[in-house]
UniProtKB/Swiss-Prot annotation:
This is Probable glycerol-3-phosphate acyltransferase. Belongs to the PlsY family. Residues 25-52, 102-111, 159-205 are cytoplasmic. Keywords: Cell inner membrane, Cell membrane, Lipid biosynthesis, Lipid metabolism, Membrane, Phospholipid biosynthesis, Phospholipid metabolism, Transferase, Transmembrane, Transmembrane helix. The gene is plsY. It is found in: Cell inner membrane. It comes from Escherichia coli (strain K12). Residues 1-3, 74-80, 133-137 are periplasmic. PANTHER family: GLYCEROL-3-PHOSPHATE ACYLTRANSFERASE-RELATED, INNER MEMBRANE PROTEIN YGIH.
Length: 205
């Protein structure tokens, strides 16, 4: 089945290149996420500039475009090595989308979707780690960073044959968050709900 893997890698990259954040913002008449808010075309920035509905739509689409190519390849019996490359291709498409001038997001939701076919137990633990970190800290970026750091250990515990490709995905996510890591270190990172607190202060009930 590895003979079909190169084609699946291309399909995964093209799926990843469909930037849902940009498309949803266009459809909803919202500002371009590449030039508004944090400048990152992802669900968190769409939440800041467009609200929950648009952000949820972006999040679901970004997860699916990572999940479906990997899931399809998994069902076809593609080996863990090639599955890892397919997952990375989907994330590379999200980060450097061919359809949008190679300027994309950070790949967190797409990476999560790509890991999901490995097992629902792993998916639940990963989602719980991200959510707990965000709830305790208020930083979406910190949730992504902590999840990326811990993901290889989770995978080693649940499905050790996927440890290497997931480790490569984690490195990619961490590299894309180098600016966030610097801002967190300097205590300059914006918390995910800061916008909503400011809005309530401006528009008291």
């Amino acid at each position: 089945m590895s003979a079909i893997a190169p084609g699946m890698i291309l399909i995964a990259y093209l799926c990843g290149s469909i930037s849902s954040a940009i498309l949803v913002c266009r459809l909803c008449g919202l500002p371009d996420p590449r030039t508004s808010g944090s400048g990152n075309p992802g669900a968190t920035n769409v939440l800041r500039i467009g609200g929950k509905g648009a952000a949820v739509a972006v999040l679901i689409f970004d997860v699916l475009k990572g999940m479906l190519p990997v899931w399809g390849a998994y069902e076809l019996g593609v080996s863990p090595f090639w599955l890892g490359l397919i997952a990375i291709a989907a994330c590379l498409g999200h980060i450097w989308p061919v359809f949008f001038g190679f300027k994309g997001g950070k790949g967190v939701a797409t990476a999560f979707g790509a890991i999901a076919p490995i097992g629902w137990d792993l998916t639940g633990v990963m989602a719980g780690t991200w959510l707990l970190t965000v709830l305790l800290s208020g930083y979406s970026s910190l949730g992504a960073i902590v999840s990326a750091l811990i993901a290889p250990f989770y995978v080693w515990w649940f499905k050790p044959q996927f440890t290497f490709p997931v480790s490569m995905l984690s490195c990619l996510i961490l590299l894309r968050h180098h600016d966030n890591i610097q801002r967190l270190w300097r205590r300059q990172e914006t918390k995910i709900w800061t916008k909503f607190k400011r809005k309530r202060e401006k528009d008291p009930e």
